[in-house]
């Protein structure tokens, strides 16, 4: 009974709050003519233009919207193009044979042109006050939208989007940009501003907190004070997001070319902990531990590789980020269980990755590669005979060597630095020189550990057990 009353009160208060917001923030449309903006059709995907023109020809409104418009206005090349329209998903499917409908939470139409997919969304409406709330819109107890397929007008759609800079609409009918929420001004001033009441919008979808940080880092903008204020105290809402979705978001955050700046802001707004709880436990006040240094360096290196259009692998990123928690876990298991270090290390890999996968559903294909990179660290110091050549034949040797170099860079460890330097020279040498380097190792072998002999038991006396 109490639960019913609480849910009823929550729904009434939420509706009153939403109605108050709508009353205060009635959309006022500003039309920016072609001569006052930088968008040209030659910079837009031909397939996106085909979708827009066909929808217009069929009598529907259709606009380019979201990050594509934002990036074009900033002079950047968009990664993809999204379309919004007053046509329903079923109506869109009737117009395009190469279309399929996707999504339960948000019903979308994907129009496929080979590898390129043009996403088409119907204008969203306000979910409160609709007679069809129960079947088309559903909220969780924390206010999160679980399902939202209320359709509306372009004015309502503009208010339903997340940030003002993503709520700009480009029309191929008259080449204008429509702005209902002041997005153009925020774009010019470099402001990330959430549309509507920030706490309500974050509760609807907590991932918006991650998006705010990502856009601020990616676009070199700042988050407005009212948008930033609730983030630290609402950060734990991310624990309610499915781990698979958080994994995808983590790649967008850390492997999009602005990973280091994003990492700093994630820590500032307390958003790193829900994503990487294992790592956060090892943070220090001055931020200068070996683990924090290796995270900073691997993200800077990743950013440089992306800027130079080089490939990056999430498995290597995770191998570096979780390396020091892994070492501490392995040492703890070895001390508590009495196992050999190699066996304790193997168990620690399982424990660290299992905990990581509880918050981020890291796919097995990546955890397998991460394990390979870690296991090779234990073999890098064993180079005598043919071991060095065999090690170099391993598919993940190069990634393992890169991690070794990173470790040498962030640790004040002369032995580790010499080992990394040896491997760098060995890889760059011709076979005869490599053989000479290995002979030098044989001439100066590392001191062997003395194995303790098993104790001899005293002879058992008669009458004793």
From Swiss-Prot:
Highest taxon listed in the record's lineage: Bacteria
Reactions catalysed: RNA(n) + ATP = RNA(n)-3'-adenine ribonucleotide + diphosphate
InterPro entries linked to this entry: NT_sf, PolA_pol_head_dom, PolA_pol_I, PolyA_pol_arg_C_dom, PolyA_RNA-bd, tRNA_ntf/polyA_polymerase_I
Keyword RNA-binding attributed: yes
Chain segments carrying region Disordered: 430-465
Pfam families associated with the record: PolyA_pol, PolyA_pol_arg_C, PolyA_pol_RNAbd
Example GO molecular function: ATP binding
EC number, UniProt record: 2.7.7.19
Residue ranges, compositional bias (Basic residues): 448-459
GO biological process: mRNA processing; polyadenylation-dependent RNA catabolic process
UniProt keyword annotations, A-Z: ATP-binding, mRNA processing, Nucleotide-binding, RNA-binding, Transcription, Transferase
Catalytic site positions: 80, 82, 162
Enzyme class: transferase
Record carries keyword Transferase: yes
Main function: Adds poly(A) tail to the 3' end of many RNAs, which usually targets these RNAs for decay. Plays a significant role in the global control of gene expression, through influencing the rate of transcript degradation, and in the general RNA quality control.
Family: Belongs to the tRNA nucleotidyltransferase/poly(A) polymerase family.
HAMAP family: PolyA_pol (MF_00957)
Name of the molecule in the record: Poly(A) polymerase I
Organism in which the protein naturally occurs: Salmonella typhimurium (strain LT2 / SGSC1412 / ATCC 700720)
Gene from which this protein is expressed: pcnB
């Amino acid at each position: 009974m109490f639960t019913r009353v609480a849910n009823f009160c929550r729904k009434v208060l939420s509706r009153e709050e939403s109605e108050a917001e709508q009353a205060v923030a009635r959309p006022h449309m500003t039309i920016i003519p072609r001569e006052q903006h930088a968008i040209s059709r030659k910079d837009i995907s031909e397939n996106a233009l085909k979708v827009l023109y066909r929808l217009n020809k069929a009598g529907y409104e259709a606009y380019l919207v979201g990050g594509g418009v934002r990036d074009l206005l900033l002079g950047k090349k968009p990664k993809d193009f999204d379309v919004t329209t007053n046509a329903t998903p079923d109506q869109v499917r009737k117009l395009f044979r190469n279309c399929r409908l996707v999504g339960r939470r948000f019903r979308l139409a994907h129009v496929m042109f080979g590898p390129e997919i043009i996403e088409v969304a119907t204008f969203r409406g306000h979910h409160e006050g609709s007679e069809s709330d129960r079947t088309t819109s559903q909220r969780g107890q924390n206010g999160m939208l679980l399902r939202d397929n209320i359709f509306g007008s372009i004015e309502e759609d503009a208010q339903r989007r997340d940030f003002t800079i993503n709520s700009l609409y480009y029309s191929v009918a008259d080449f204008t940009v429509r702005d209902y929420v002041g997005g153009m001004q925020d774009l010019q001033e470099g402001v990330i501003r959430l549309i509507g009441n920030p706490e309500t919008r974050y509760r609807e979808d907590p991932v918006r907190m991650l998006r705010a940080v990502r856009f601020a880092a990616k676009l070199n903008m700042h988050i407005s004070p009212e948008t930033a204020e609730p983030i630290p105290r609402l950060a734990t809402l991310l624990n309610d997001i499915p781990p698979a979705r958080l994994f995808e978001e983590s790649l967008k955050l850390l492997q999009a070319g602005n990973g280091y700046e994003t990492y700093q802001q994630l820590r500032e707004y307390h958003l790193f902990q829900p994503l990487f709880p294992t790592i956060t436990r090892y943070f220090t006040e001055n931020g200068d531990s070996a683990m924090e240094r290796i995270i900073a360096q691997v993200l800077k290196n990743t950013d440089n590789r992306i800027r130079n259009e080089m490939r990056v692998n999430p498995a290597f990123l995770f191998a570096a980020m979780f390396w020091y928690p892994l070492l501490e876990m392995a040492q703890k298991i070895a001390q508590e269980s009495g196992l050999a270090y190699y066996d304790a290390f193997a168990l620690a890999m399982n424990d660290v990755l299992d905990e990581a996968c509880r918050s981020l559903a890291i796919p097995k294909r990546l955890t397998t590669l991460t394990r390979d990179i870690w296991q090779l660290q234990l073999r890098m110091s064993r180079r005598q005979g043919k071991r060095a050549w065999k090690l170099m034949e391993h598919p993940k040797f190069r990634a393992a060597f890169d991690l070794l170099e990173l470790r040498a860079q962030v640790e004040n460890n002369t032995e580790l630095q010499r080992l990394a330097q040896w491997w760098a020279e060995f890889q760059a040498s011709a076979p005869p020189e490599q053989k000479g380097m290995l002979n030098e190792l044989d001439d100066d072998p590392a001191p062997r550990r003395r194995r303790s002999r098993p104790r001899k038991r005293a002879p058992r006396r008669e009458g004793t057990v």
